[in-house]
């Protein structure tokens, strides 16, 4: 029996609704938040599958969608040497259950997704920032997060510590034009008259 059939058989046995999706060459499924933990637990404990390793957990943001956030779980079966992708779609107001009781490693991953996107995981109360500063405002990987951020950090000589203050751009926005302003001179430089029509072959260039 193929891997996809084994997974679908396992899901049906546990009354878990899953939807196959295309993610390049990887086997992938989409599940609703309420089916996430039963599905992860079944995949991990199945003697046939043994997806016992959570290799990654991350988020993406598609603000044009009603369910703007994707939370993606990458699983590995050492027994089968196979990988599996599980996706969960949620809106900005929805939460997603924490997988900490199934995969201990998910704690840090969930903190990262919260830090970058503001997605809340039920059961994981550790909301400490993990990539940004503890007093950072907002979630920088959201598509609607401003490029400048909301605050800037500077060392305050009077306070003798790092202080937060409103963004004050020292350099104005510029329009970057990567075309060169340098052009070859139209006049003949001394010695150019001695140039031959053919550059030596070892240079690899001919006129």
Curated annotation (Swiss-Prot):
SUPFAM superfamilies: Nqo5-like. GO terms for molecular function: NADH dehydrogenase (ubiquinone) activity; NADH:ubiquinone reductase (non-electrogenic) activity; quinone binding. It is found in: Cell inner membrane. It comes from the Bacteria. It holds the Pfam family Complex1_30kDa. Keywords: Cell inner membrane, Cell membrane, Membrane, NAD, Quinone, Translocase, Transport, Ubiquinone. It is an enzyme of class 7 (translocase). The keyword Membrane applies. It catalyses: a quinone + NADH + 5 H(+)(in) = a quinol + NAD(+) + 4 H(+)(out). Its EC number is 7.1.1.-. Belongs to the complex I 30 kDa subunit family. NDH-1 shuttles electrons from NADH, via FMN and iron-sulfur (Fe-S) centers, to quinones in the respiratory chain. The immediate electron acceptor for the enzyme in this species is believed to be ubiquinone. Couples the redox reaction to proton translocation (for every two electrons transferred, four hydrogen ions are translocated across the cytoplasmic membrane), and thus conserves the redox energy in a proton gradient. PANTHER family: NADH DEHYDROGENASE [UBIQUINONE] IRON-SULFUR PROTEIN 3, MITOCHONDRIAL, NADH DEHYDROGENASE UBIQUINONE IRON-SULFUR PROTEIN 3. NDH-1 is composed of 14 different subunits. Subunits NuoB, C, D, E, F, and G constitute the peripheral sector of the complex. This is NADH-quinone oxidoreductase subunit C. It comes from Rickettsia felis (strain ATCC VR-1525 / URRWXCal2). The lineage of its organism: Bacteria, Pseudomonadati, Pseudomonadota, Alphaproteobacteria, Rickettsiales. The gene is nuoC.
